[in-house]
Amino acid sequence: MSNVLELTIPASTANLGVGFDSIGMALDKFLHLSVKETSGTKWEYIFHDDASKQLPTDETNFIYHVAQQVASKYSVDLPILCIEMRSDIPLARGLGSSASALVGAIYIANYFGDIQLSKHEVLQLATEIEGHPDNVAPTIYGGLIAGFYNDVSKETSVAHIDIPDVDVIVTIPTYELKTEASRRALPQKLTHSEAVKSSAISNTMICALAQHNYELAGKLMQQDGFHEPYRQHLIAEFDEVKTIASQHNAYATVISGAGPTILIFSRKENSGELVRSLNSQVVSCHSELVDINISGVKERIVYQ
């Protein structure tokens, strides 16, 4: 029998308000993949959660498509594979489910194609496919990361930021919000003065996080001009959640990625009460505390 590739891939939250398409943080929700060669004639999928059972099992499957794309880039052929999948990451909720699947697909191609990619190369590939590093970088490395993708040189640069000493709460609505629909809400252009203002806020927020000044960082996280003002109306619960969080003296309430999940930076002494208040008052969502993931994707080979 063939060896089994086991992957544990974290979720991620992008933007942190003012870091549009550049800042992301890994979270302890996971996509679990167990992959091995099979004697069948086409790739097989075994889904262990209800959400994943919605995914296609033909060549339109995202993991299949990306794995074959990577294999083609390095001129290797992949064997017929069986993929077992279980995910804690809700689909189309702004928690990086597609980035987790993308990173998983690259690892699958790397192992079964014997490509020998470095982690740096995995990052470059993932960002080139995704178009921005805000989800894929923390998914690969863990922690909180700022990054930039140069779409001319096709190079990605990242910088790691200290893990914030806050409690993280995610409020997850029951409905999906596709990234494409969320991006359509954004303006095509910003004035020079608007761009300068938002850039200055983002720069200062990063410095505040680096100095562990969460009061200032949280204040600035909520002053985005790139995307939040144009997306908040797509999330019916946003204002109510922000009000409740403010009543519990939270540092910041922002959209997670493209939404509809809402991300809260909470004071540790208030987080439990805040989560309970959210779950009792905002019944259309599920709120929970989630740890910041510091390890990134984990790979394990089971020899058979």
Curated annotation (Swiss-Prot):
Q: Where is it mostly found?
A: cytoplasm
Q: Where does the UniProt annotation locate this protein?
A: Cytoplasm
- Tell me which EC number(s) this protein carries: 2.7.1.39
Query: Among its keywords, does the record have Ribonucleoprotein?
Result: no
Q: Name one GO molecular function term.
A: ATP binding
What pathway is this protein a component of? Amino-acid biosynthesis; L-threonine biosynthesis; L-threonine from L-aspartate: step 4/5
Question: Which reaction(s) are listed as its catalytic activity?
Answer: L-homoserine + ATP = O-phospho-L-homoserine + ADP + H(+)
Q: Which UniProt keywords apply?
A: Amino-acid biosynthesis, ATP-binding, Cytoplasm, Kinase, Nucleotide-binding, Threonine biosynthesis, Transferase
- One GO biological process term: threonine biosynthetic process
Q: Fetch the InterPro entries from UniProt.
A: GHMP_kinase_C_dom (IPR013750), GHMP_kinase_C_sf (IPR036554), GHMP_kinase_N_dom (IPR006204), GHMP_knse_ATP-bd_CS (IPR006203), Homoserine_kinase (IPR000870), Ribosomal_Su5_D2-typ_SF (IPR020568), Ribsml_uS5_D2-typ_fold_subgr (IPR014721)
Cellular component GO terms, alphabetical: cytoplasm
Q: Does the keyword Protein biosynthesis apply?
A: no
Report residues binding ATP: P90, L91, A92, R93, G94, L95, G96, S97, S98, A99, S100
Q: Which SUPFAM superfamilies match?
A: GHMP Kinase, C-terminal domain (SSF55060), Ribosomal protein S5 domain 2-like (SSF54211)
Q: Which family does it belong to?
A: Belongs to the GHMP kinase family. Homoserine kinase subfamily.
What this protein is reported to do is described as: Catalyzes the ATP-dependent phosphorylation of L-homoserine to L-homoserine phosphate.
Protein name in the entry: Homoserine kinase
Give the organism, scientific name.
Staphylococcus aureus (strain JH9)
